């Protein structure tokens, strides 16, 4: 716990080092993050239930098909939200940013840049939610845990390293890289679990045939 708090303090220190306007813009986009993620969260809950029910019924083929359709719907939804954010995001961000002349204008620039980055890679986040939920529905908690650790490592590493190389723009990519880090664990993990389920069903069928 102590090391985690130390890392969080270090990350916050990096954010704070870019000044008040950057902090305000960064925080404004983070507040909007919940809106970007809301559909992904809902899809995730649905996929946990769907996967669990079909697993219990022994319909593993439906899990594979449902995951494919779920990912497709999630990605399409993310594209729609991305389009909406590019059209109306600047106006929405204005609700979270102070109207103070100089700093307000600078904060708006940072917030808009950050929002465009996150929106452009929103499909990565939606895949994360859906695949993680399917794995949880299969009864596996280790893979989602490991993905969370990778997500944390990527976010922290990017926050501490990228600003040194690319300035304030570097820190704006930390969240997106964290999503990618999680997906790098979840997608192979899902493929492994799917193969394991299909293999188990095949073995069960062989036993029943022998009987």
Where are these regions (language model features)?
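Short, small-residue-biased leader/transition segments that mark boundaries at the very start
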Residues: 1-7
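Helix-terminus/linker motif at the lipid-water interface of multi-pass membrane proteins
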Residues: 7-35, 53, 93-102, 164-165
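Alpha-helical transmembrane segments of multipass membrane proteins
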Residues: 9-14, 35, 83, 130-134, ...
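Membrane-helix interface/capping residues of multi-pass secondary transporters
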Residues: 20-23, 141, 168-171
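Small-residue-rich hydrophobic transmembrane alpha-helices
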Residues: 25-89, 125-147
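Short runs within selected transmembrane alpha-helices of multi-pass transporters and secretion channels
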Residues: 44, 118-137, 143-158, 171-187
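Short alpha-helical transmembrane segments in multi-pass integral membrane proteins
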Residues: 51-120, 162-211
